Design a protein with these regions (language model features):
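C-terminal functional regions that serve as terminal interaction/effector modules
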Residues: 26-27, 31-217
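Intrinsically disordered, low-complexity linker/loop segments enriched in Gly/Pro
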Residues: 1-39
Length: 217
């Protein structure tokens, strides 16, 4: 099964550009957006760059939370598809143009700075104005209301598994991986000496592994 890791990467609005695409390291290919990290076996694709000094040491995270941890995996509970983002319709992207009235959602008049009303609340976020796809200068921009996922993270809330809360949107995305199984964070309480809120959920699936940080309400 071909697994698209790009959906687990940071989006184009994230200042950490080195997280916007997968990278390879030690026989694995990694992807992360800072909330979750997924890795699959490296099939030798030349288009994927090697880990740089800016990339996190994801291998150490998997070693700590899967290889050195007494995990008891269970089949991922059924996760109902979350409500799609009302701004992008579930696409994760919207059509927008650079706002001509401001810089990143603000403009200066005299000695004061003001919030731009032209792009305030736009689907693409501050500094972008909504536009039709066929508008001459329209660009395909990550939706600012769902962090490129196509589903609102806040509106869909969290799901309790094993005593810890996890983003329903991220759980659902991970549940689509083949034969996905999960070990909730609280299963590692005794061996790591930390609570469920501090320990990521460990997941395994056919061809790879993942870690998901709990959500604090």
């Amino acid at each position: 099964m071909n697994i698209d890791l790009q959906r687990f990467c940071a989006n184009e609005n994230d200042p950490r550009e080195y997280l916007r695409a997968p990278w390879r390291d030690g026989g694995w290919v990694y992807a992360t957006n800072g909330h979750l990290v997924v890795r699959i076996r490296d099939d030798g694709a030349e288009s994927i760059p090697a880990r740089s000094s800016r990339h996190p040491n994801a291998a150490a995270m998997f070693r700590k939370h899967i290889e050195d941890r007494s995990c008891e995996f269970m089949v991922m509970p059924p996760i109902t598809e979350p409500d799609k983002c009302t701004h992008c319709g579930g696409a994760g992207f919207v059509s927008a143009i650079k706002c001509e009235d401001c810089v990143d959602g603000e403009f200066t008049h005299g000695d004061y700075e003001y919030t731009c009303k032209n792009c305030c609340g736009s689907a693409a976020g501050p500094g972008w104005a909504d536009a039709y796809e066929k508008y001459p200068s329209a660009q395909r921009v990550p939706c600012a209301h769902c962090d490129f996922m196509g589903y609102s993270l806040n509106r869909n809330g969290a799901t309790n598994i094993g005593g810890a809360l996890y983003s329903t949107v991220y759980l659902w995305a991970l549940s689509l991986l083949p034969q996905c199984r999960i070990c909730p964070g609280d299963a590692a309480y005794s061996c790591l000496g930390t609570g469920a809120r501090e320990t990521p959920a460990a997941l395994i699936f056919d061809g790879g592994q993942a870690l998901l940080m709990p959500r604090i309400e």
